[in-house]
């Protein structure tokens, strides 16, 4: 069950961009209490993240119109307020409020 407030990232281990940003997802999980990862192919990816949702059946992905991973969504009052598709460092920084998130990574990678 997805939380109606906070940040949710849709991810999968088989996605090269998701693998690239695994440390980013781990950092967000530590810094943002209302953060969940919905994993499309491995319920243990990314490692070290407590709030993981197993979406191997893709039910949550379908309901949220996810076309590629990673997709980061900010929910407010139970509704989608904003989304970033792929790794967009500025977009992820804006949604998470972490100003140095992804330092050392490329500025953009498609999902």
Go through the PLM ranges and name each one:
Residues 22-25, 51, 87-88:
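Short, glycine/charged-enriched secondary-structure capping and boundary segments
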Residues 63, 67-109:
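Non-catalytic, surface beta->alpha helical segment in thiol-disulfide oxidoreductase systems
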Residues 32-57:
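Thiol-based oxidoreductase modules, predominantly thioredoxin-like and allied folds used
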Residues 25-26, 42-43, 62-63:
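Short, flexible, glycine/charge-rich loop motifs used to bind or transfer phosphoryl groups or to couple energy/partner
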Residues 28-30:
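Short, acidic, metal-binding catalytic loop of nucleotide-sugar glycosyltransferases
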Residues 13-14, 42, 79, 88:
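Short, glycine/serine-rich, charged loops/turns that create anion-binding
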Residues 2-25, 34-36:
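Short active-site neighborhood of thiol/selenol oxidoreductases, capturing the structured segment around
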